[in-house]
């Protein structure tokens, strides 16, 4: 990555975070803006209707097809939290996901490390794809269903570098209040959520300097995070395709993949489904954003409701 490209991305990041500052949003708020935003929201909903409102139509489209569930973790199964180490899934959500996995092949694709997601979800019998799909594990084909095997790690050569960069960034950012660096095995995340606006530029500059020293890493942006990951052509969309292939159903016309996620990194998976012309994405968001998703849900509570209705529908089709 060129230094100018890095600088441009950093500047864009700082500008976007500044624009999202609550004080700036409130200071420019007026009745005219409310009306305008309502119109924009209505237009957006028309393009990405609620998956709850459209549930019956979705299920009609699913008749005779094998539904495969792909779920993001943060902001989808769990709430976004100030402390990223405390983004716990509720017992109720865990039980719903367990039921979903009973009736449908299920995978959780997250930017976190696979081990961290597994420690939160605590369910066996499902596929986990951590580090944005760079660390994929799934159930074995043996009778010992509690065992799991590594299926794919396309960035394994980068492990020593990631370990090194995590330590470098922790040292460089320790003087910036609120900044934290999370080791996600095959990528790393710099969290902005607790950093005051006055510290954004300094933090971004430290990330820029690290990227100059480690040109084999690339920069991506998520919800109040910067992420550094290997410069390989791999993302959540590639992970979705890999899982469909590994399950032996990638070429089947009777499969309906459903991906639910809230972050811009999930757009790679939404885009894959659009390009396949098979299945659909559901964006979890209370705000208007550009997306390849077909439907929307507002928050994890609505995700839970959608999954509950999905399980109920399946039980009814089976006569249970």
Curated annotation (Swiss-Prot):
Keywords: Hydrolase, Stress response
Pfam families membership: Trehalose_PPase (PF02358)
Pathway involvement of the protein, from the record: Glycan biosynthesis; trehalose biosynthesis
GO molecular function terms listed in the Swiss-Prot or TrEMBL record: trehalose-phosphatase activity
Signal sequence residues: none
EC number per UniProt: 3.1.3.12
Protein's GO biological process: trehalose biosynthetic process
Names of the cofactor(s): a divalent metal cation
Reaction it catalyzes: alpha,alpha-trehalose 6-phosphate + H2O = alpha,alpha-trehalose + phosphate
InterPro entries assigned to the protein according to its UniProt record, in alphabetical order: HAD-like_sf (IPR036412), HAD-SF_hydro_IIB (IPR006379), HAD_sf (IPR023214), OTSB-like (IPR044651), Trehalose_PPase (IPR003337)
Functional description taken from the UniProt entry: Removes the phosphate from trehalose 6-phosphate to produce free trehalose. Trehalose accumulation in plant may improve abiotic stress tolerance.
Protein family: Belongs to the trehalose phosphatase family.
Name under which the protein is recorded: Probable trehalose-phosphate phosphatase C
Gene: TPPC
């Amino acid at each position: 990555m060129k230094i100018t490209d890095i600088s441009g991305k950093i500047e864009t990041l700082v500008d976007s975070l500044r624009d999202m500052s609550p004080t700036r949003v409130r200071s420019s708020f007026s009745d005219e803006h409310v009306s305008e935003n309502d119109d924009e929201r209505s237009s957006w909903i028309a393009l990405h209707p609620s998956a709850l409102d459209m549930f019956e139509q979705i299920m009609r489209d699913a008749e005779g097809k094998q539904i495969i569930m792909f779920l993001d973790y943060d902001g989808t199964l769990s709430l976004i939290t100030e402390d990223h180490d405390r983004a716990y899934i509720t017992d109720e959500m865990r039980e719903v996901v367990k039921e979903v996995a009973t009736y449908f092949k299920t995978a959780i694709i997250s930017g976190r490390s696979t081990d961290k997601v597994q420690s939160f979800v605590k369910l066996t019998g499902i596929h986990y794809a951590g580090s944005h799909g760079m660390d994929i594990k799934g159930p074995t084909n043996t009778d010992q269903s509690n065992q799991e095997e590594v299926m794919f790690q396309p960035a394994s050569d980068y492990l020593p570098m990631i370990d090194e960069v995590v330590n470098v960034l922790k040292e460089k950012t320790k003087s910036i209040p609120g900044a934290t660096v999370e080791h996600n095995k095959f990528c790393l995340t710099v969290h902005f959520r607790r950093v005051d606006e006055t510290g954004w530029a300094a933090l971004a500059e430290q990330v820029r300097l690290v990227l100059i020293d480690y040109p084999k890493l690339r920069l991506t942006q998520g919800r109040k995070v910067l992420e550094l990951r290997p410069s390989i052509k791999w993302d959540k969309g590639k992970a979705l395709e890999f899982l469909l292939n590994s399950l032996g159903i990638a070429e089947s016309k009777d499969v309906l993949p459903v991906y639910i996620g809230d972050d811009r990194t999930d757009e790679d998976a939404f885009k894959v489904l659009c390009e396949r012309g098979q299945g659909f994405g559901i964006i979890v968001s209370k705000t208007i954003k550009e997306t390849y998703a077909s439907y929307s849900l507002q928050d994890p509570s609505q995700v839970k409701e959608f999954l509950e209705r999905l399980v109920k529908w399946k039980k009814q089709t089976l006569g249970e």
